């Protein structure tokens, strides 16, 4: 019997190897086609770029967003061609050049001038618009003249976003000697307390962990805080941080404090929050409704029942060499699809809520460094993550609300770049996709599919998926067994302690 099992295993492995070889062959063929297409189009590129630039100017003049204001405050609806026009300190201008910030984005053009004048700001802009630099630049410009500890505090809804905001401050403040620290849940409180005792200029934090330190870390206070920023404020409130925000606002000073509130949307909750925390703010709106950028191509792919895995592998093969985020609805699916991709020799890493903070940052670092071309994620990655070079977003599972769809596809086509999103739509997703199309105000075109390739891939992909599921089940059983063992040891120790009494 064991020989029969081994022969079956060998046959299955051979089939998987064969599939991987076929995929690689197809990938090479696709890459050759891309290279040939680029060569043919090379002579036309200059004229195309000129035409594109002219087209962008026309579109810009037609679609300038109106800038509404709170309490009649206003800022001019103008754009700037360089950061030097904003009258920043030389160190900041040079840092922008070092980061290849060619010119301020619309939200930066609208928000930075009134912020430099000392106004409170409400910034409303779609994802990928450069919101972080829009509040970091005026804070750092003022910090250059003051250089005080605990100068600014930025509140973010997730640990990943907080870490990325810190990276932006560190990069922009690299020539200014700026000290920053990231205070988030899931990390050691004592290590964070030591970082706070070093008196950083900038604190980036999730609300709950900041409140922990305000209440429990001796010597830490924000009584002299000059700037408070609430980034992704709509998300902060969606995640039930409202009561914690109220407590924080009561602790920190209101006199001589400048407050910025940035959000993708303006809701009644946001309006209530800004009334409680801001004074005569200037409202800078680039977009006042759910929408996607013009450089994003959005399509859907109708998937017959039971073939979603095969269609996904088909897409990975068609877009070989591109960076991709695959969004799923569950943590188990994220882990399973990551394993399936890797088994079929597509380099992937997973990002979901079952990973600890170090594992999450490790996955992100692998993806951002180009060591993995595919990130399989739940919606934990959909908001705030600044990964500039994502070519394609795939919705393996359609999100249940339209706002999540907007935030997912906003991971590509960021800061003027082009990008593509593809949604895998089954018969059960029709109502969800109709709602999304209603919000977008347009029908999503269908992606073409080579059905012959789908049929060729189907059996092998199903077998590979079966292997991944078996491996996940095996790991889960081991995890449960380890848990039982620990509980048994704890109960034994408790019984011993009771006997000693």
UniProtKB/Swiss-Prot annotation:
Protein name: ATP-dependent rRNA helicase RRP3
Biased composition (Basic and acidic residues): 491-501
Gene that this sequence comes from: RRP3
Regulation: ATPase activity is stimulated upon the addition of RNA.
Domain named Helicase C-terminal: residues: 307-461
Source organism: Saccharomyces cerevisiae (strain ATCC 204508 / S288c)
Keywords linked to the UniProt accession: ATP-binding, Coiled coil, Helicase, Hydrolase, Nucleotide-binding, Nucleus, Phosphoprotein, Ribosome biogenesis, RNA-binding, rRNA processing
GO MF annotation: an example: RNA binding
UniProt short sequence motif DEAD box, positions renumbered to this chain: 231-234
Residue span(s) of domain Helicase ATP-binding: 112-284
